[in-house]
Regions:
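Active-site proximal loops enriched in glycine and acidic residues that flank catalytic Cys/His/Asp
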Residues: 45, 111, 138, 228-230, ...
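Extended active-site and interfacial segments that coordinate phosphate-rich ligands
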Residues: 57-91, 115-182, 238-269, 313-321, ...
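Feature captures the catalytic cores and cofactor-binding loops of soluble hydro-lyases/lyases
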Residues: 282-342
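Conserved catalytic alpha/beta cores of large enzymes that bind or transform nucleotide phosphates
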Residues: 133-225, 230-232, 267-277, 288, ...
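Structural motif
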Residues: 40-42, 106-107, 119, 132-134, ...
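N-terminal beta-alpha lobe that positions the nucleotide/phosphoryl donor
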Residues: 1-106, 196-204, 217, 261-266, ...
Length: 342
């Protein structure tokens, strides 16, 4: 019930911070602050379930960017904990038969990278399971626009062994997120026509990021889904997690389908392989999710974690924006639902 969910969240948000937590938050901030005045930090959730590494929890828990001062850091930690009990997080666990008592959450406080460019890299091709390819998707500013699928990012395919750039797709990136220097808040900026169509990463950056992806996979021992950010001449890896969709993608790729005759009216990126058909339902925002019935084709500008309950009913998913590494793509692959994005 919504009332119970709200009570649990409120209890987390209002709980007294014990001295240990307050000290840990301050120590983390002091460590990051060394040599800087009141640094901005990112407070990131990291959720996992015992013995269930095949689920991504993509977008289910909260992350807070551009947080400043220890009191606000402690508050953000509270809110990360409380995000275990949002309606969408509870639904995700129920639908996947998770024991709520065996789901855990860690909270990471890290330096906030005021990024000029950012995005996502996969150490294998997530749409085909080609283990010899690294996929990089990038946009200008903060990486939120790429991760959420709010823009169609540049896409780079790199050979994992030679680091040769095999393919580049430069898309029209309509806007970027950036930090307002006066308020410290994340703002949206519409890009000029020329900037929107400009290649985000140069060749040196692409190769540097690809090498980082390969190194991460070797360190963890399995394919990784990572987020990166660049500032100055440095590349930062801000998070990584195991790729959770290999088995379902392999099954879909192995299936053979007859080619459908007819005029091609739209094209996009194959984010999750397969074929699906059904009644097309266009969803303009989360308030319209009740439109979706079992077996429909869900069409939207983009998806977010609140769409998961509707996505699970869909026979196929199409979005205007996004790349092969965005939320819609990851969740579609996890559910085994055919999806085209961008």
């Amino acid at each position: 019930p919504v009332e119970i969910i709200n009570d649990i969240k409120k209890a987390y948000e209002n709980m007294n911070v014990n001295l240990d937590l307050a000290n840990v938050s301050k120590q983390a901030l002091d460590f990051i602050q060394t040599g800087r005045d009141n640094p901005f930090v990112a407070v990131r959730s990291s959720a996992t379930a015992e013995d269930l590494p095949e689920f991504s929890f993509a977008g289910q828990q909260a992350t807070y960017l551009n947080v400043r001062k220890s009191d606000y850091v402690a508050q953000a930690v509270h809110q990360c904990w409380a995000s275990l009990y949002t309606a969408r997080a509870i639904y995700y666990r129920e639908k996947n038969n998770f024991d709520h008592n065996k789901v855990f959450i860690a909270v990471v406080v890290q330096k906030m990278v005021d990024s000029e460019k950012a995005g996502v890299m996969f150490s294998i091709n997530p749409a085909t399971n080609n283990e010899d390819e690294i996929i990089i998707e990038a946009g200008f500013g903060f990486g939120d626009a790429v991760v959420s699928g709010a823009i169609s990012p540049d896409n780079y395919v790199v050979d994992k062994h030679t680091f040769e750039i095999k393919n580049k797709t430069i898309n029209n990136k309509e806007f970027m997120f950036y930090r307002d220097p006066n308020t410290g808040r994340t703002n949206k900026r519409i890009l000029s026509h020329d900037k929107a169509k400009m290649q985000v990463l140069n060749e040196s950056e692409i190769i540097q990021i690809a090498k980082l992806a390969k190194k991460s996979e070797e360190y963890y021992g399995n394919p990784q889904d990572m987020e990166f950010a660049t500032a100055g001449n440095k590349v930062y890896m801000v998070q990584t997690r195991a790729i959770t969709t290999q088995a379902k993608v392999s099954k879909a790729v192995a299936e053979k389908f007859d080619e459908i005759e007819g005029e091609e009216i739209l094209s996009g990126i194959s984010a999750s392989p397969g074929v699906g058909k059904g009644k097309v339902k266009i969803v303009n925002n989360a308030d319209e999710l009740s439109k979706i019935s079992e077996g429909d084709v869900l069409v939207a500008k983009m998806t977010n974690p609140d769409y998961v309950s509707a996505m699970q009913k869909a026979r196929a998913i199409i979005t205007d924006e996004g790349g092969s590494t965005c939320h819609a793509a990851i969740v579609s692959r996890e559910m085994g639902i055919p999806s085209v994005v961008g």
